[in-house]
Amino acid sequence: MERIKKQLTELIGHTPLLELSRLGKAHQAQARIIAKLEYFNPGGSVKDRIALAMIEDAEERGILKPGAVIIEPTSGNTGVGLAWVAGVKGYKTILTMPETMSVERQNLLKAMGAKLVLTPGSKGMRGAIEKANELRDNTPGAVILQQFENPANPRTHIATTAQEIWEDTDGKVDVFIAGVGTGGTVSGVGEGLKQHNPHIEIIAVEPDSSAVLSGDKPGMHKIQGIGAGFIPKTYNPKVVDRVIRVADDDAIRTGRELSLKEGLLTGISAGAATFAALQVASQPEYAGKNIVVLLPDTGERYLSTALYAFEEYPL
């Protein structure tokens, strides 16, 4: 039987699950930690899912027309997804991004054909959003897909990511953990899983130094991709059972451990989510349970960051 795809978008999703047995053993985990490896998506991250979903939703609603320009504020991964999906579909992209994002991310976006506009790092994602709105107002035919507000974001995780996890664990999932950038992943997957079993615990992860979900003020942090500094409309607190705060150092060291113990080259936010999973898995009440943690992207986008500052963060 022929198995040839017609275009790259057909390869989005159906990413594998991997048990982190060596890492779990090293940390005396009493629960089973299972990673959802989202860097198996064509663009290298979970954000391919929402890029395709938001573009197709906008097409169906008549918002995106031939020759349109897509503008989007991004910390990197959504931009990569939008750039390549838009390219496949014939749209141009202009992306706004805090200047503090890794040089790998910046170069990757340019390589994908996007025009990149950097904003002050001190303003975080709010600064990127403000700049995107300004560019839209001055660019004929421009559309902002609004990943922080667009219901197509969590909706695609309900329909795809959650169902994949449920099916691939044969319904044996007790806890789901994910970092919060837009909040679409943890909210959508959480809602999708709870449709099958309302007792599944959903845990959100945020930077300790910018813990706005926990009621603190926004602040600077090193965990790129999560901790936008505000609570997005795509984050649904009713789905989330609790929030775990993770310090930069713990996220970075755990990210490095994933590489050394499991051979997984992942990003800093994957380290944060995995650190949270290890904390939960060490508690006696979770003994024998299955914890699924979503690892959003590949570490190749962070080689110039603190994640690989070996002298500053020795293991």
Positions of predicted regions on the chain:
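PLP-dependent amino-acid enzyme catalytic core
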Residues: 1-315
